[in-house]
């Protein structure tokens, strides 16, 4: 069985010049095999302080290449704590009081749009099956991009970082949000911080409203300490979902990787497998099915 690290080592290294900067990204092409139509795409966004290889190892979403997906992982433009960070509209980086001067010329939402265009030129991709995922700062960027991109995305998955920018008339593609009740970096109940002022359930509820879903979610206990809130639409689907994990801090639950798994500080949890959930969600909303 191929390990996550081996999968990442197979990834192609590419560069894209955007906004006067050379931006790097990793690409895993769909593994050869019969397919009836162009491939679905996942763009996986790293957290602040890490990079694309660490994100793919932690999320395990590179494994989707074996199921017919193309998987791309770009790199943020701002150096941060030994890794990289994304420039998010109107807010400073975590732990910083003001927006960096160097961030003023970086529009990472526009960069992601340019990346989608670049990938469309490199591979036969299905424009109706584009998916965006991210952890922490990557999830916050995914939230902004999902609103800005309109119908360019089939779905989005945000682990430890969902936000709801924009208003009720803005785009709201299917959303899977996973968050820990013990998260001290991006607290579940919000914080006195312009970067993270809205409680997670409120952000998801506003997303559901924009998507035309019921305001009151269906609540289930899917496992001990794991509560799912699913907002249904008029067709009976559940395209907006929040998974709250009681034992989880600021980590990607279920990953064996210590960088995303919070093993060092004890904030991780094996109560929920976010990687499997994200793969299943993408398969449900436009992607090829992947176990």
Regions found by a protein language model. Give the residues of each.
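A domain-start/cap signature at the N-terminus of enzymes
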Residues: 1-41, 53-54, 69, 104-109, ...
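Short substrate-entry loop that stabilizes the transition state in hydrolases
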Residues: 33-82, 153, 165-166, 184-187
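Short, proline-enriched alpha-helix->beta-strand connector loops that line the catalytic pocket
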Residues: 170-175, 236-240
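Short beta-strand/loop motif that positions the catalytic acidic residue
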Residues: 177-179
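Active-site-adjacent alpha-helix of alpha/beta-hydrolase-fold enzymes
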Residues: 181-240, 248, 254-273
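Acidic/histidine-rich helix-loop elements
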Residues: 82-101, 256-270
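Alpha/beta-hydrolase active-site loop
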Residues: 93-123, 144
